[in-house]
Amino acid sequence: MTTVSMRDMLQAGVHFGHQTRYWNPKMKPFIFGARNGVHIINLEHTVPMFNEALAFISNVASKKGKVLFVGTKRAASEAIKEAAVSCDQYYVDHRWLGGMLTNWKTVRQSIKRLKDLESQSVDGTFDKLTKKEALMRTRELDKLEKSLGGIKNMAGLPDVIFVIGADHEHIAIKEANNLGIPVVAVVDTNSSPDGINYIIPGNDDAMRSIRLYTQSVAAAAKAGRGQDLAVQAEQDGFVEAE
């Protein structure tokens, strides 16, 4: 099972929160103290809470569940995409479009348009258009790919969303809450933990911290998917040779 240790977190700087003047009092239970005007997060809480979240994600993946990685701020977007792709899951790394979950029917139409344009770009359709029309469609394709590329093969709502930066992604969290989709989120000392099923109190700005979260969640999803494949193989009558 994927787990993260106190040492891993210390090395990644997970314990460094925001400046004390920007704190959210709702995070008080997870704060150890302050040093040089910066809140220090109590990793005695974060370690078990993160490992519980990883076990939950692994369990979701073991049942063929869909995990949606969400991180649209600059520090998180690249790591979010890499991690989701590495474990065959889904991601939003550019901008959260309002209604992405709650208005899925409309989003699905946009995904259909994206896939149509992708087909046109490779089957020669663009070559038959005027330069202006081809350019317009290329721009539309790029725009849709940026917004929806990470969910174009999701085929329905996710079973859990994993969020880096609860304050930045509050719209995504609210939509998931409205639909009863569980939320796993990294919550820094300046954010509210409300509406989050699995709170991970930790630094949501440092690249090393973000990579620790995203890579661990990807590993948990892979491990869960491996369990699912092992069960499937057993059901299909495949047994590994000694």
UniProtKB/Swiss-Prot annotation:
Biological processes annotated in GO: translation
Alphabetic keyword roster: Ribonucleoprotein, Ribosomal protein
Gene3D superfamilies referenced in this protein's UniProt entry, alphabetically: Glucose-6-phosphate isomerase like protein, domain 1, Helix hairpin bin
GO molecular function terms noted in the UniProt entry: structural constituent of ribosome
A single GO cellular-component term on record: cytosolic small ribosomal subunit
Signal peptide region: none
Cysteine pairs bridged by disulfides in the record: none
InterPro entries membership: Ribosomal_uS2 (IPR001865), Ribosomal_uS2_bac/mit/plastid (IPR005706), Ribosomal_uS2_CS (IPR018130), Ribosomal_uS2_flav_dom_sf (IPR023591)
Top-level division of the source organism's lineage: Bacteria
Family: Belongs to the universal ribosomal protein uS2 family.
Full protein name: Small ribosomal subunit protein uS2
